Amino acid sequence: MTENITTETRPSIYGLTRDQLIEWAIENGEKKFRATQVWDWLYRKRVQSFEEMSNLSAVFIDKLNEAFILNPLEQVVVQESADGTVKYLFMLPDKVMIETVLMRQSYGLSVCVTTQVGCNMGCTFCASGILKKERDVTAGEIVSQIMLVQKYFDERGLDERVSHVVVMGIGEPFDNYEHLMNFLRVINDDNGLAIGARHITVSTCGFMPAKIKEFAHENLQINLAISLHAPNNELRTSLMRITRNAPLEKLFEAIDYYTETTNRRVTYEYIMLSGENDSPEIAQQLADLIKPRNKLSYVNLIPYNPVAEHIKYERSTKDNTAKFYDVLKKNGINCVVRQEHGTDIDAACGQLRSKQIKKNKAKLA
């Protein structure tokens, strides 16, 4: 796998799985246990440089420095919310920027990672797609987001660790499938960060139903979420243009294949847009769509975070959201209204990045 696609000629070592690191070490004249030592320094001791790996020879450290960098991300902006949510803006070696979000949950620290610089999916309500995709984020750069968030707590002497990960940041994860899978295997490794598969969720808009089928055979018990947002093709196409090429019939054929293959539940994300997709009639359509597969389904109703560039959309009222929820519950649909995080900072995914890029352009003008 080609890990590096930036101006930095060396890839991040975080992009290697443990088996890949062992293979590299042996190819470079080192014993297998040396790679295991490096892995331990990276993920258990969480050092910030190869020079800190005190049980390695100077020759081996030189080899590591010649072949890899550690963390390729530079922290640009940090926004902290009153509820404990932290939003980070990171710069990559080629000066493009990505967002990462830490959310404090009752069950631990959850991090939302970004998989692409910009997004081409064209969802009309989303801040992430305002700036189009420039490139994929490499596996090492995705892992680095987790490592820098963990460093944030380590440096403050806080005995807390990242325990949950959601792949719901900027970009479409299944459009960066190879790097996504390497990232998942790195963070799920029991000898490393050891983030349990059932504590990891990957979200897709379903633009490539075939990838959902492929994901079913990865032999990982990672949670799958579908960005649905509408129960019929006409409405969904108006909100998500990818529906033209991946209509609901194709999407749900792939979802049914996934659930039959894995026997794992699928979460459906549904953003509540006032006057667009929040009527009781639409709720009944959604219930009718989910009901045949309700045993392995869960609907997540999401309050909309307004985006300046998308002024036509407003958040559903609490009353309309409650009525929508009630229709689903009366139909026996497993559902919840998502708890909000970070409402006093740039809450919408992609908003912080968009603002910073505008600031940078204004400085150059």
UniProtKB/Swiss-Prot annotation:
GO biological process: rRNA base methylation; tRNA methylation
Keyword Cytoplasm: yes
Cofactor note: Binds 1 [4Fe-4S] cluster. The cluster is coordinated with 3 cysteines and an exchangeable S-adenosyl-L-methionine.
UniProt KW keywords: 4Fe-4S, Cytoplasm, Disulfide bond, Iron, Iron-sulfur, Metal-binding, Methyltransferase, rRNA processing, S-adenosyl-L-methionine, Transferase, tRNA processing
InterPro entries: Aldolase_TIM, Methyltransferase_A, RlmN_N, RNA_MTrfase_RlmN, rRNA_lsu_MTrfase_RlmN/Cfr, rSAM
Subcellular location: Cytoplasm
Cofactor(s) needed: [4Fe-4S] cluster
EC number, as in UniProt: 2.1.1.192
Binding site for S-adenosyl-L-methionine: 171-172, 203, 227-229, 305
Pfam family, one: RlmN_N
Protein name, UniProt field: Probable dual-specificity RNA methyltransferase RlmN
Encoding gene per record: rlmN
